[in-house]
UniProtKB/Swiss-Prot annotation:
Domain of life according to the entry: Eukaryota
Source organism (scientific name): Saccharomyces cerevisiae (strain ATCC 204508 / S288c)
Description of its domains: The VASt domain bind sterols.
Chief location category: endoplasmic reticulum
Role according to the record: May be involved in sterol transfer between intracellular membranes.
GO terms classed as biological process: intracellular sterol transport; positive regulation of transcription by RNA polymerase II
InterPro entries: AH/BAR_dom_sf, BAR_dom, PH-like_dom_sf, PH_domain, Sip3/Lam1_BAR, Sip3_PH, VASt
Membrane-topology descriptor: Single-pass membrane protein
Designated name of the protein: Membrane-anchored lipid-binding protein SIP3
Lineage summary: Eukaryota, Fungi, Dikarya, Ascomycota, Saccharomycotina
Positions of glycan attachment: N1206
Stretches in topological domain Cytoplasmic: 1-1066
Amino acid sequence: MSVHGRDPKKRQLRLISVAFKEASIDSPSFRASVNFFQTRVDALEDWIEKTVDFFDQKYKVSFEDFRRAKETLLSQLLPPPALLSNGFVSNQSFTPRLIDSFNKDYYDFSMKLLQIVKGDDSSHSTALLELMTTAIEPYRNVRKNFDFYQGKYDSMLASYQAIRISKTSLEPSSIKSDALQLFEVQKNYLKASLDLISAISAVKLSLDKFILESMKVLKSRSIFITKDSGRKIDLSPCINEYLDNYAIWVENSIEGSKVLDSDISNAKKQAYRYTLKRITPSSDTSDYNIRSIHSSKLLSKDTQVPPKSPEKSGWLYMKTQVGKPTREIWVRRWCFLKNAVFGMFLLSPSKTYVEETDKFGVFLTNVRYDPEEDRKFCFEVKIFGNKVTEAHDNMSKDITLVFQTSNYLDLKSWLIAFEATKKYVMSIQHDSLEYELAFKRFSPKFFEFASSTTTSIDQLITTFDKETESLYETLNCSISEYDILTLGEEKVFQFQMPTTPISTKMTQLAILSNFLTKGSWFPNAVLANIWGTTDWSEYTILPGKGKKPSSLLTIDGKRLPIRNSTIYPQYYSNELKVLDLQFKSLVFSPDQRLEKLPEELLLFKFEALWCPNKKQKFSATCFCTKDYIYCYMNSMEFICLTKISLSEIVSVEADRSSKKTLKLYDASGLQMKAIVLFSDYKLIASKLQYLLENKAIKNPNSNEEILVKFEQMEKESQEKKQEELYKIEQENSFDRKATSVSKIIKSRVTFWEMSDDASTLLNRLKKLQTEYSITYNHEYEISSKGLAHILFGDKSNAFPKCLFLARKDGEEHGKRFWYKNKDINGKSQLVRKIPFRLDMTGNFLNTGKYHRDKESKMIFATQRIVKIVDNKYYEVDLDPFFVKVPFCHLLKLSIKFVITESYDVDNHLEIKLNMTASSSSLHVLYKLEYIDSRTGKTIEKLSLAEIICQTWALKFAHSEFLLIRRVLRYYLEKIGKHGKVIKAIKLCGILGVLSNKSEEPATEKNGNSKESESMQYDIRYSCTILFLVFIKLMVYRVTNLTFVFFRILIGILLLCAEKFSRINRMMVVGLLASIMINILLSEKASVPYWSIKRAEKLFHDRLGSDKFTMQRAIYISDSDLLSSQLSVPSNNPIFEKFSEDNFNKDYQYSETRKQLAMRRNELLIELRILQDMEKQLVHDDYEKFLLEEVNKCSMVSIEMTDLWFNDTQLQNYCSICNEELEKLRPPIT
């Protein structure tokens, strides 16, 4: 499917290769189709040979004789000029010369006509030679290879199966060896079969190309060019249109086939690999030991009931007898077990189509392993007689069938399939179709497809009952030349029969046979000649659900009729009947789960090239019904079935940039593209657009009305083909478009239509506005009809979402239909009830679940359509709500919705009756009244509380109107800009009327009960809720004032920032740079300052206080601790000896030494302080000097490595600098 812009998987094409699948399993359908195609090739070559012989031996000779006779005739048409040249005519001067010129010119004209008739045999021969060399000859080579391996495989298989197990020399190893040899031949046969399918596809497309080129050659000779003016005259203009279509189809098909080359190759490889896995012989030698096979090993007693009916199919050899006297032979039959039915297919005597035998329910059979048979891997199927089946009188005896499989595993699988099927049938319901099928026997539906083989067993298992018919007699048809089916006096090809997945001699008859049948629950020969033997049920498409019926039992419970003629209505033409049979055969019949074919009638079909993307193009046949477009695609043996629901399409447009191209758009804007061929693409677009419009209205037209409309369209299309002026065509297309739009707008989706003019409606609206308290209105870019469907359609969720007091999270939203009701005056109205849960505070109090249980009671909003003028005016009332508020009378709240077309004074609505306006106005009117709960009278004088309450109610009404606008904006954004009315109808539903009165809401009966009693309120506000509302409003006001203050403050700051941003930026940058530099310099100068400051502070702390006296005596030995420069070294032995000898003498000078020591302490402290001060003065400079030296050393060590390593003195100097620098830096603690 063509997909542009969204979700490629949603429209992804699902291609299947029916031909490759049938070739991989070597089915009878495959063999019949390739044999029938060979007969077509032989017929084509015979036609070519006969045509060439006729052209060379008869046509050329006859043409030359005719040309000479023609020249003789032309020379004698007029008297010779010489005869008239001697006074024989009056105009002696010009008549003889005029005759001579006329004879020459007329001769040239005649020769041109003869050349057109003769044709260009050289160009035609070139196209024919290309066909033979590029398609026919390669096909012949592939076919020769196929015939060789098919014959070899069939003969080896027959020999392999014919081995007698009674031979004493038969060993499992020899059987295994034969099986492996057969497998090697089967692999070559499989490859040849797949290659043959590809070759057949190439021949088909090449033949189309040859026919196109031949037509072009013949058409080119029909162009006559005048001698005098050189003007070209087309002698056959009617050929141009369909020849151009054919050329487009051939060119695109060839281009598409090249794109599919890789897919074809992958499909062949996949089929080859899968089949090899399936047919590979077992490597276990015990599987070939015939004498070890026992029934107990083949069937397990613990076989479980399968979840669905088992399926099994394949070739088996069947034992039968022929001739008189009878002799035993073994023949191949394609056997199948499906849906609890066992049956057989076989090739016809001509081997060009598939035939069938009777089908038997599994409970009419008894299956067992047959060890008595002198062949390997045999089993017996015993079919019971009419003890169970009373419908077949010629079945009086039981029939015993003996089948032979090719290997042990295949034998086991067949026996298990029968056993599992019986268990499955017994586990299902006994009134189901599958259960009934298991006990029935079915004869072939038609004589033409029944087995015509004369063997004894085939005749026993092929019977006919009163339901078996002859298609030739019933349909009045026959097979004519080239095996073409003739229906009455018309050839079937005149009904545009499409290419089926499988083509056999009886394919066209099989398609027509669907006229006499309605589906099948099991395989049959009709389906095998169209779709092959494979079950493609999972790939089919149906219009609705419920593919599997529960029961098909008839009244007597014994008969299951499987034939039922299709009954077409009287208005359905014969051509449409044949097209409908094609449609159902290609689209629905492959589904073997169907009780009967869907009863959808085909309305028209068209051929197209379906374009899923920019590269791929598939040849497609599109079948259109009232509700769907079904597409059957067949390109290079790839089949695809898909459908498009018309309910998903909103518009069909002809692509102006590409001729013959249609674009289909769905509601989301998804685009599908198709190139329409062999039909007027504008006519197809008109038909599809009409079906879309018909689908959108409330009461769609019937098939008969649609076909009548299509006939009118076709007649108009034929008339328009005669028109050549572009201006007239444009006007007609505009009129057609206007008419189409008018029909959409005038479709009656309500049950009545009124016709008031615009001024009356406008005056009515003005009068209503004076009667209501307040009116809110808003303009929308959509027609009034579309807006009405958005708000009041039965699928719209606008209500109760638009109601101010409705819970927005309620689960009551759903379809709410309108139903007829009568008002007080007896007039009909449309009424509906919308349930919703009440939420009295949720829209203005964030109180969470406060009083949620009490506030969430279920109430109903009743809407009544008061007046409708379709497409112009819609008036809907909402029944009043009664609200009870403390200290106030009962408040009655009435709401009216009015939708009108936008009124323009310059363009009155009555002059645009056939066109809908592009915009409309929504008016919401509110009326608030206080009434006496007892009398129901309106209160005129309001109290202060009632005035305040009314003010609040009007404020909340405005909030509700804003909510309505928000909901409408959501729907309009979802609808988009195009096709608004149709999208609104599809999205939001229609103003539908219930046909069943029992579906009316039960609350309608109770709706008027409160009118008869005293006035009751719907909504009650308690004092607590009002208090919360008051507190909430106060908080809201305070919060607003706070936010206003902060807003002003932020505004001032922003203003200052704006003013500051206008200052010179360079000045700001300079100031910032100056500040940074000053910070760095002050940091550098502050370090020594604060060091001295700390020293001074320490000094004053130590000595500056008068209240603190510190005395310390420092002796010679103590002074060594402070300074080694002011005393004798401590390790001086002479001084030590002196100290020991004079120790006693020192005591008498102790006082004097003490004073000296104290003085010494003072002097040392002062000296140390001075030393530190002096050191601090030079510390920074010295550190800076050391840093520079260290940097220089580092630079020399990096940039002058030779100098650095050779100069040890420099290295020592640098190391000393590093050490000194480390000493100056304080240690890290």
